[in-house]
Every structure is written in C-alpha cells, then in structure tokens.
C-alpha cells in the first residue's frame, strides 16, 4: 500500500495520459511539418515538354527548426494583454498558442538554383493549449497560486478551453496498427481472410489495408475439407488502389519470388503439411511466370493502367510498415498466408478482436497529431492551388526569368492566409472530428462534465469504443480477461456498458518512441538478427522477431535476447514503455514501442528468484519505475501482450524459488478506477452495489470546484455544508476539500413495514442548521452585436446604464436581468420559470 501512496503523491496522476500525449504532440509538430516538406511547384514547359522553372518551398526552412510558438494573448481596448485560462472562460475566448514559421524558397530557372529565406515569418494559426501541459502557464504552478489565478486547487488539467467552454478529448479505443487479424465467414466467396492495416514509420504515407482471402466451395465429394465443411480453393491478395483481388502467385512473382517452389517455401518455411492447399493458387496464376508480366497484370487493374504505378503500389503502399524492400514484403505476405491457412484448417483459433493485445487506445495527443497531420496536408494542397491561381492571373509576366521569383517572394503571405489547419482543429473541437468523411469520428470532443468534481475526473479518464448503435453485438460489451488491471471492472456506464470504460487507477497509455532504439541496443549487445532475405527452409525452427508488427528477421538465441532486453528496460537503457514478450506457441518474439498501449505497474521476480520490492527502496513513484545500471527499477509496466506471456501472483510470497511466478500485483486497489477506489469495502459488496456507488457518486451534490465563485458556469450546484465521510477510502485523502455529501444519522423504523423506500422524516432543526443546504447557480448570457449604439438605459431600478442587472439584486420571475436595444425597440431578458434568488455576479 505504501507504493500506492507514493503514486497518489505524483502531480497530475489522474490525467497524465492526456498531459504526456499532448506534450508529445507539441514536440512532434516540427516533425509533422518536416515530413511534408518541400512543396514543389513546376511552371513553363518548353518544346520538349520539360518544365523550365521549379520552386521548392520549405516551411520552417530546410531543417523545420525556424518555428516560433507564441504565448496566448488577447486584445482589449487596442492593448494586447496576456491571456490566462480563467480569462478565456469569462471572455468566451480560446486558450491557444500560435505558430509562426520562416519560409525557404529554392527557385530553379533553366537549371540555375537560387535560395531565398525572407525574414518575415508566415502565420500558420492558433491552436488550443491543454491546461497544465508544458506550454500552459499553469504548468508546475503551486495550488495556492493557481487558486489566485481563478483555478481550482485540486484541478489536474487535461482539458481545453474553446470559446470559453471547457472541452475534453475522449480517449478512443481502436485496432492496433500493423497487426494481422484473421476472420471466418468474410463473404460468400471468400470464407477465410487475414487482413492488416499498415502504417509507415515516417507517417507520410496514409494507412492502407492489405488482405489475403481464400475462396471456398461446399464440395461434399472433396477429401480435403476444413472443419467448417468447406473446401479451400485459390488464394488472392487485395492490394491498395487495385480494383480486383490479385492471385497470390502473381503478387509473389511481382515481389520477386518467381518459381512455384520458392513461393510455397516463402509461405510455409518448412511446414510442408499445408502444401496440398496451394494447388488451386498455382493454377490461378497460369501464364504469368515473370516479374515483368506480373507487374503488368497488376497495373492493368489500377486507375493509371501502367506497370510503373504497380511498382509504386508495391514499394510505397503495400505493407508500408515493412519498408521498401520487395523481398521483405514477400516474406511477410507468406507469413499472412500461413496464418490464414492455420486458422482455416483449425490449427489456430480465429483472432480475438476484443483482446487488448490487438487494440490500442488513442489519447488526446495522438488524436490531435493525426488531425493536425491531415489538415496540414490539406493546407499545403491549398497553398499549391493559390500559387497556381496567382501565376495564372499574370502568366506572361511571371514566365519571364527575372520575374518568376517575385511570384513567391512578393505573395507568399497570401498563400498562407487561409488557415485550414487551425480551422480544422477548431471544427474538430466543436463536433466534426476528422479531415475527411472516411476519418470522421463522433463524440471525440465533448464539453467537460462539471456537475461534480468526481464527474469531471471520470470524464477525463473515460475511454470509448466507437460502436454503431444499430450493431447488435455482445462480445465488445463483455469484460475481457485482457482488460484485467487496465480498466475498472465495476464502474460500468449503464446502457453503454463495455463501450464506455474507465481507466484503472495506475494504468497508463504509452507515448511511443522510435523502434530504431531497440535495434541499436541489440546491435550494441551483439544480439544477432538474421535478415529475411537470408532465410531458408531450414530457418523454420528459428524464432521470428516482430518489432511494432514489422517482421525484422529471426534470432537464434531467444532466451538470451529476451533476458538482455528485459534487463535493459529495467536498468533504463530502454524506455520503461517497451513491451517484450516471447510467445513460445507461435515461436515469435514480439517487441512493441508504439503509442496507445495500455500498461499497468507490477512488482517482478528477478533472475535470482527474488521479489523486486523491498521497504528500504521506497521512494518517489518516478524513482521506483525508472532504473539505472547500478539499481534496476522496483516496479515495471506491462501491457496486455506481455501480461499474456507472464504468470502474475496476487500476493507477495516470502520465497519464489519453487514457483513459476514472473510478477506480483502491487495492491488490489490498483485494479480499480477513480470511482471504484472511493467505494468502501468494494471486495465485500455485490456488483450492483459497487456499480450504483460509482454512478451515483458522480451525480452527488458537492463542491464541484474550489474556485466556483470566480467562474461563470452555465449551471452549477454547490453543497454549502459538505462533510468528509466518517468512513472513507485512503484514495479520498487528496480531495478532502471537495466534499460530496453529509454524514446523516438515519433511524429505520421497520416494525410495521414502514421503510426508507416509502418516505423520510427529517429533523427540522437539522435542516434549519443547514443540512443538505445547496446553492444553485444559473448564468444568463447575451452578446452585443453592435457596440456603437449610443442608447443609455434609464428608468429601471434593477439595471445599470449598460442594461445589465446590478449585483445582489433580488431575482423574481418578473425581474429584468438584461435589456437589449435594436433601433428604438428594447428587449428584456427574464429569468426562467420558478427561478428565484439573488444576482451573485455580473461580468
């Protein structure tokens, strides 16, 4: 339990998954811009159909380092002032940072290249800041100082302020990248299927789906039938940007594997008991025996109908996570074929799509990264259109060699006037998340629920699976064993059970780091990797090495490799987010460094069969989870993939020498979430009681914000005399200043059947002393469309000369709150029905 206390002392522990991912996103903005540089524009063809002029445009110069991030400001009465988060709330502004960039032009005229970098920067746009992130003014500010700035002492941040409204980006649950998924009953023609969505490492190429399908027929006379009663026929491959499925052997020959024997060996790698199932596929590729003919065949089904475009598809679009080498893609395609064959013949089960081994969670930073990338790509396309439009307006002038540079140097500010990236992000926060109709998501950005402090934190820790309401599927709603320790098992969300989940207390979402770091460490420790092009039939017994879904090669000493890499992670040589697992059944070593993996902390049993935990090593949570050469970490994080190959004990033992345990749980409370840990004796209650406790505690009247007096919320309910519960969870200690109830002494009169469900008798003096006394706040807001109207409101005792009700005015149904004038007519704003009280504040 001491370790859990150390975790609770960490700043921002409730929303670190948002803060860390947003900080990572901001650091990656220069990389996003760099990957899409340069923008090339060609002009003025000569007689030989060759362009004489060319201009290459680099945003942020050639290194993308000339980017300036500006602080948030606003203008009042012509004076520019710094913008603080609470000012943004009160003034209905967006709390943002700006980006300015220098532009480098490389202008080529008849082979002569000149380079220009104007001093004046272009404005790329204003982009929302996550509160308490590294670029926020509240970052690392003490609670009392935050309180003086209008913030809550206990508010962890992790949300945005858009037009004065607090917005939260909900974590989205989705399929893992570069992961093969097998399926039965794919279609009437293709019963068995294996598909993969490939993402390139540089992020420049958009993700593409590739698939292997097996055609089947119901042939009762066949002696070779699967357990599903169907006969396997030809295998085909679905390629990106190719209209029809292509026979497997044609694709293999296009990738450079020519003979039937080589193709079968590439697929099976010595597992010869599946050879008979390739007969139909061999016949399906009759007449195409060379790489050239195979590329021509594939090209005929593309929009350009060319061999060159077929090469482009295979090199850049098909299995882009495998790099540019065609032979590597051939081996990976063979691996997919073998996987779908083993599934079809009942050797392996169908892929479990609901397992978190095959899922990732995208926090706010990852979602913003993808949205920024897509809209920035659109903005560059728009810049190209603007350049063409400016050129066509005065084509003869700009076609002169001396005038061509002025097309760019004199007009480059106009090219970036349309801030598509900024507008796209703001539109996403207001409901339409996604740059295209294919990437749009519903409900990603939502208004932060400020009904209570508990509801706000639960909203920030929610994870959503996008599922169509019309889909009558049950499996995604069930509690999956791979979710153990990653999600709260008792905090369900009513009708959205299973699709709306709450992160457990200590779980985190990985940020990701380049996989090259793992390869560098393996090279440094001389852990040999056999490249794919060196594999032979005899290599079937070697252990495959997959790194972020990419088949890197094979290794001869898996035990040594596994031990070395795990020790490197525990000693800080590799990041603690690295996942290393050896699946002996699949004869594969999986290593993951990508973002979006859910991890949870555990003690581990070291190679000496000693538990990593010892009271003498207690320190800060960061110190216990990060090790060095001299002192390995005491706690390590595991994801669902690594947990699948581990044996985890629930209680620490005195001696682990006679056990097979690899890890031990830290404490039972780490399995529950924010609300589950506030439920008392959760392990002794039936599930409905725990579920009701989580749901109803979120809706309890409370002090939702310690600085509610300085806010103008649309609606707010405050418990005036809240109390700390007599029986409380240790987890409640950091939030005692935000009570959500009162300690009531209840007597139940059960003698005659009169029960609490019938009625409650209150002690009058308790109510008079303030028991359950609450304050309800309602904000009325109007916008002034024209500030030049000289009318001064007079003749009303409630409103001032600006037409706004005065503070401390008693409010009744006929009280005028605001008076609005248009011409000679005046419109009065009255309170809603049955709302009475006093004016607390005007702004």
Model-derived regions, located:
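Short, basic/aromatic beta-hairpin or loop at an interaction surface
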Residues: 143-144, 520, 782-798
């Amino acid at each position: 339990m001491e370790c859990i206390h150390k975790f609770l002392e960490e700043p921002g522990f409730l929303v670190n998954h948002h803060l860390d991912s947003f900080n990572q996103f901001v650091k990656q903005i220069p990389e996003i811009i760099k990957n899409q540089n340069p923008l090339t524009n060609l002009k003025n063809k000569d007689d030989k159909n060759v362009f004489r002029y060319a201009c290459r445009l680099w945003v942020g110069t050639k290194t993308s380092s000339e980017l300036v991030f500006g602080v948030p400001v606003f203008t009042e009465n012509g004076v520019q002032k710094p913008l603080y988060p609470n000012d943004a709330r009160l003034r209905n502004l967006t709390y943002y940072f700006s980006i300015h960039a220098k532009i480098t032009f490389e202008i080529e005229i008849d082979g002569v290249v000149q380079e220009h970098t104007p001093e004046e920067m272009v404005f790329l746009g204003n982009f929302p800041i996550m509160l308490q992130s590294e670029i926020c003014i509240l970052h690392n500010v003490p609670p009392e100082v935050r309180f003086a700035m209008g913030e809550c002492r206990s508010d962890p941040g992790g949300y945005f302020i858009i037009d004065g409204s607090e917005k939260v980006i909900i974590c989205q649950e989705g399929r893992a990248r570069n992961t093969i998924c097998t399926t039965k009953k794919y279609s009437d023609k293709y019963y068995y299927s294996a598909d993969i969505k490939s993402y390139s490492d540089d992020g420049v190429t958009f993700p593409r789906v590739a698939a292997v399908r097996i055609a089947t027929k119901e042939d009762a006379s066949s002696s070779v039938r699967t357990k599903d009663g169907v006969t396997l026929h030809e295998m085909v491959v679905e390629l990106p940007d190719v209209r029809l499925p292509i026979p497997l052997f044609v694709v293999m020959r296009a990738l450079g594997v020519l003979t039937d024997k080589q193709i079968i060996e590439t697929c099976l790698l010595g597992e010869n008991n599946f050879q008979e199932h390739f007969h139909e596929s061999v016949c399906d590729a009759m007449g195409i025996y060379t790489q050239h003919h195979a590329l021509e065949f594939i090209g005929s089904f593309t929009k350009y109908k060319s061999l060159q475009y077929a090469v482009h598809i295979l090199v850049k679009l098909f299995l882009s996570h495998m790099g540019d080498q065609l032979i590597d893609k051939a081996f990976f395609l063979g691996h997919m074929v073998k996987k779908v064959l083993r599934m079809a013949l009942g050797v392996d089960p169908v892929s479990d799509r609901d397992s978190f081994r095959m899922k990732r969670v995208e926090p706010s930073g990852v979602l913003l990264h993808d949205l920024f990338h897509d809209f920035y790509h659109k903005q560059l396309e728009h810049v190209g259109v603007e350049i063409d439009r400016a050129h066509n307006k005065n084509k003869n002038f700009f076609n002169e060699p001396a005038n061509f540079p002025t097309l760019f140097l004199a007009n480059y500010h106009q090219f970036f006037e349309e801030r598509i990236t900024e507008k796209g992000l703001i539109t996403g926060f207001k409901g339409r998340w996604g740059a295209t109709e294919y990437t749009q998501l519903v409900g990603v950005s939502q208004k932060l629920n400020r009904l209570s402090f508990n509801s706000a934190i639960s909203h920030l820790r929610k994870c959503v699976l996008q599922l169509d309401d019309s889909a009558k599927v049950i499996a995604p709603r069930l509690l999956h064993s791979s979710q153990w320790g990653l999600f709260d098992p008792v905090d369900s969300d009513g009708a959205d059970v299973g699709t709306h989940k709450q992160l457990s207390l200590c779980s985190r979402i990985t940020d990701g780091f380049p996989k090259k770091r793992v390869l560098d460490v393996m090279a440094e420790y001389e852990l040999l990797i056999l490249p794919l092009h060196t594999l032979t039939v005899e290599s079937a017994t070697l252990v495959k090495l997959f790194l972020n879904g990419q088949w890197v090669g094979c290794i001869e000493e898996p035990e040594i490799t596994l031990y070395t890499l795990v020790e490197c992670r525990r000693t800080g040589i590799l990041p603690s987010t690295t996942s290393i697992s050896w699946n002996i059944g699949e004869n594969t070593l999986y290593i993951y460094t990508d973002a979006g993996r859910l991890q949870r902390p555990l003690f581990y049993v070291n190679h000496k069969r000693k538990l990593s935990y010892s009271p003498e090593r207690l320190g800060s949570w960061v110190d216990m989870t990060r090790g060095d050469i001299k002192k390995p970490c005491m706690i390590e994080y595991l994801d669902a993939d690594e947990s699948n190959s581990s044996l985890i004990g629930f209680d620490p033992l005195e001696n682990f020498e006679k056990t097979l345990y690899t890890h031990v749980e830290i404490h039972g409370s780490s399995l529950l979430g924010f609300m589950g840990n506030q439920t008392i004796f959760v392990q002794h209650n039936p599930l409905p009681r725990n579920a009701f406790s989580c749901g109803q505690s979120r809706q309890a009247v409370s002090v939702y914000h310690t600085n509610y007096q300085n806010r103008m919320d649309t609606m707010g309910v405050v418990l005036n005399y809240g109390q700390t519960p007599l029986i409380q969870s240790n987890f409640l200690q950091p939030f005692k200043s935000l009570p959500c109830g009162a300690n009531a002494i209840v007597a139940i009169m059960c003698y005659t059947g009169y029960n609490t469900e019938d009625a409650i008798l209150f002690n009058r003096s308790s109510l008079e002393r303030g028991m359950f006394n609450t304050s309800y706040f309602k904000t009325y807001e109007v916008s002034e469309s024209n500030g030049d109207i000289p009318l001064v409101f007079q003749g009303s005792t409630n409103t001032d000369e600006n037409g706004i009700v005065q503070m401390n005015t008693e409010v009744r149904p006929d009280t005028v709150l605001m008076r609005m004038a248009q011409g000679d007519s005046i419109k009065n704003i009255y309170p809603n029905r049955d709302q009475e009280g006093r004016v607390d504040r005007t702004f």
